[in-house]
Every structure is written in structure tokens, then in C-alpha cells.
Swiss-Prot record:
Name recorded for this polypeptide: Glutaredoxin-1
Keyword Transport: yes
Main localization (coarse): virion
Recorded family membership: Belongs to the glutaredoxin family.
Organism lineage string: Viruses, Varidnaviria, Bamfordvirae, Nucleocytoviricota, Pokkesviricetes
Any one GO CC term of the record: virion component
PROSITE patterns from the UniProt entry: GLUTAREDOXIN_1, GLUTAREDOXIN_2
Organism expressing this protein natively: Vaccinia virus (strain Copenhagen)
Source species, domain of life: Viruses
Domain Glutaredoxin residues, every copy: 3-106
Cited InterPro entries: GLR_AS (IPR011767), GLRX1 (IPR047185), Glutaredoxin (IPR002109), Glutaredoxin_euk/vir (IPR011899), Glutaredoxin_subgr (IPR014025), Thioredoxin-like_sf (IPR036249)
The keyword Metal-binding belongs to this UniProt entry's keyword annotation: no
Length: 108
């Protein structure tokens, strides 16, 4: 069930972030991503509380990404990791270029 839950959300080749809103790392990751203007439907925030039991979901994250913690961030079906990974990409000033290259940002 966890596999289906996750894979359905990754199917549209968008930016997907799995979060728990009480997690400060999740809020920080959302702050980074919210600096960008995404195309409609190209960015999805998934609260892991939507899935029960949560441990099954975390086990599946570990299976496919190597980590159980949130946030779990995907560009398309590719996991980029968690908050520290996103922060590193952002600090290298590469995040905007990556998001643009995968076609999820609005163009003016």
C-alpha cells in the first residue's frame, strides 16, 4: 500500500515533497521551494499523516531512498534526499537551474 501511495504521487513527473508539518526541517525545505513559481500541478506537498500506518510509509522511503526521515523530496521519480540535500543544492545556486531544466517553473 505504501508503494502505491508514493508512486501515484510521483507519476506526473513533478516536484513532490513528503512532509510532516510539525517537522522544522520540512518547514525549512518548504521555505526554500516556495521561493520559486511553479507551473500549476508541477509541485505537490504530501502530508505523511494522510497515510496509516506511518511506519509502513517510512519503511518504503528507506527502501527506495535510503532514508526514513522527512522531508523526502523528489524531482520526478528521482529522490534528491531530504532538507540538507535541498539546502546544499540551493546554496550552490543550482536549484533554479535544475527546476527549470525539468520544466516545472513558470516562465514570464
Amino acid at each position: 500500500m505504501a508503494e502505491e501511495f508514493v508512486q501515484q504521487r510521483l507519476a506526473n513527473n513533478k516536484v513532490t515533497i513528503f512532509v510532516k508539518y510539525t517537522c522544522p526541517f520540512c518547514r525549512n525545505a518548504l521555505d526554500i521551494l516556495n521561493k520559486f513559481s511553479f507551473k500549476r500541478g508541477a509541485y505537490e506537498i504530501v502530508d505523511i499523516k494522510e497515510f496509516k500506518p506511518e511506519n509502513e510509509l517510512r519503511d518504503y522511503f528507506e527502501q527506495i531512498t535510503g532514508g526514513r526521515t522527512v522531508p523526502r523530496i523528489f524531482f520526478g521519480k528521482t529522490s534528491i534526499g531530504g532538507y540538507s540535500d535541498l539546502l546544499e543544492i540551493d546554496n550552490m545556486d543550482a536549484l533554479g537551474d535544475i527546476l527549470s531544466s525539468i520544466g516545472v517553473l513558470r516562465t514570464c
